[in-house]
Amino acid sequence: MTQTLKYASRVFHRVRWAPELGASLGYREYHSARRSLADIPGPSTPSFLAELFCKGGLSRLHELQVQGAAHFGPVWLASFGTVRTVYVAAPALVEELLRQEGPRPERCSFSPWTEHRRCRQRACGLLTAEGEEWQRLRSLLAPLLLRPQAAARYAGTLNNVVCDLVRRLRRQRGRGTGPPALVRDVAGEFYKFGLEGIAAVLLGSRLGCLEAQVPPDTETFIRAVGSVFVSTLLTMAMPHWLRHLVPGPWGRLCRDWDQMFAFAQRHVERREAEAAMRNGGQPEKDLESGAHLTHFLFREELPAQSILGNVTELLLAGVDTVSNTLSWALYELSRHPEVQTALHSEITAALSPGSSAYPSATVLSQLPLLKAVVKEVLRLYPVVPGNSRVPDKDIHVGDYIIPKNTLVTLCHYATSRDPAQFPEPNSFRPARWLGEGPTPHPFASLPFGFGKRSCMGRRLAELELQMALAQILTHFEVQPEPGAAPVRPKTRTVLVPERSINLQFLDR
């Protein structure tokens, strides 16, 4: 009976979206003819380059997705030098493409990050590896990160980090001009929180990011994280030959990654030495100790260079994802006090009567409004506004045949702000995830991706965000800076606030 119901639900799901899929694919007749790349509409190369370099398009790539869909439809083509990119901005077409993926989906193969690894003879981690190496790393890490119970295992560690964040927010209030409860540049504080949290999980040790005096090497790492995304965007936009004439972006990218690798190496070696001392010089055997690095270090098939590459890249991923999403969440909650009040009530109701303990990871994952707030923030401000694929075979996308080895960009920002999927798409409305209004296409908002290339740290990031929001709203009422203008997002490889977000944290 259970299997029958599961099968029926899958069939219902496919039938339900069949009309939209057919419309998006342009199937007017059963024998609709497929068309080639030459038939795909798009901007001329001069106008595309002018948009990127003369009109600030590099920092507005997310907005260009929306403009492209409005001007050319759900599929368009743009050329930059010898590189042709197909842009896909309809949920049904995104689904069609992703469901044609093979066992080892490839992303943009000319990443400057991969080039840095090659130049410095560094091993690639999960973010930069491709092919068999990527598949091996993902198979190794998936049981440690993707399963819900695996993330919940770190709840105690993360709870301690969140408590330190609350204390730091208290200390940071009233510095400089403005109201006494104002904390300036909350994203900067949450960068420290993100690094402390992911390091506690990866290394099983604390870095002191949330102390009154932040260690200098930690500040250097955080600056490198912010800088590397800017230099990545500039480097990818430049032809390779131009680096000799304008060496700045590539030089900064290498410097930033060198600093991050040096930071990770110091802490990996320290962690390895501590583990050896605890075990009398023998490898650490406790694979349930809660530190992912224990799993990395003492599996013979993972070389030391691969351990370092993975730790460095996971530290980077953990910092930016959590810090930006938490900044946007509190920004929107401060501007929508009715949602903040309802969420505070939901969180306090989950506390045990007479208990000062915070809700457990299991309880937090069952709070509907809390989950809806996180989903709505990620819909409005996806950390990665667009994803890329390089198919290893010819694929069909709507009316078109996309040849293998063609770069395809999935426009997640455009689909998540599509008014056909989300009424009032630019409004913060968590209730849309609680049954209010039409149900969007399941591929309309994919902040963590889909399939084999989906975000490995999704469970951990969701838990960290839920715990941080729960504790912050338990202690503080969050209000906007008086007289502050709205903050818009900008592209810096990832989506970030265009300027500092300043918020008031008033004691409850």
Swiss-Prot record:
Its EC number is 1.14.15.18. Changing E189G: In VDDR1A; 22% of wild-type activity. It catalyses: calcidiol + 2 reduced [adrenodoxin] + O2 + 2 H(+) = calcitriol + 2 oxidized [adrenodoxin] + H2O; secalciferol + 2 reduced [adrenodoxin] + O2 + 2 H(+) = calcitetrol + 2 oxidized [adrenodoxin] + H2O; 25-hydroxy-24-oxocalciol + 2 reduced [adrenodoxin] + O2 + 2 H(+) = (1S)-1,25-dihydroxy-24-oxocalciol + 2 oxidized [adrenodoxin] + H2O; 25-hydroxyvitamin D2 + 2 reduced [adrenodoxin] + O2 + 2 H(+) = 1alpha,25-dihydroxyvitamin D2 + 2 oxidized [adrenodoxin] + H2O. Its cofactor is heme. One of its GO terms (biological process) is positive regulation of keratinocyte differentiation. InterPro entries: CYP11_CYP27_families, Cyt_P450, Cyt_P450_CS, Cyt_P450_E_grp-I, Cyt_P450_sf. It comes from the Eukaryota. One of its GO terms (molecular function) is heme binding. Kidney. Activated by cardiolipin and dioleoyl phosphatidylethanolamine (DOPE), phospholipids found in the inner mitochondrial membrane. Inhibited by high substrate concentration. Keywords: Disease variant, Heme, Iron, Lipid metabolism, Membrane, Metal-binding, Mitochondrion, Monooxygenase, Oxidoreductase, Transit peptide. Changing R107H: In VDDR1A; complete loss of activity. Its main location: mitochondrion. Heme binds at C455. Pathway: Hormone biosynthesis; vitamin D biosynthesis. Changing R335P: In VDDR1A; complete loss of activity. Pfam families: p450. Transmembrane segments: none annotated. It is found in: Mitochondrion membrane. Changing R389C: In VDDR1A; complete loss of activity. It is linked to Rickets vitamin D-dependent 1A: A disorder caused by a selective deficiency of the active form of vitamin D (1,25-dihydroxyvitamin D3) and resulting in defective bone mineralization and clinical features of rickets. Belongs to the cytochrome P450 family. A cytochrome P450 monooxygenase involved in vitamin D metabolism and in calcium and phosphorus homeostasis. Catalyzes the rate-limiting step in the activation of vitamin D in the kidney, namely the hydroxylation of 25-hydroxyvitamin D3/calcidiol at the C1alpha-position to form the hormonally active form of vitamin D3, 1alpha,25-dihydroxyvitamin D3/calcitriol that acts via the vitamin D receptor (VDR). Has 1alpha-hydroxylase activity on vitamin D intermediates of the CYP24A1-mediated inactivation pathway. This is 25-hydroxyvitamin D-1 alpha hydroxylase, mitochondrial. It comes from Homo sapiens. The lineage of its organism: Eukaryota, Metazoa, Chordata, Craniata, Vertebrata.
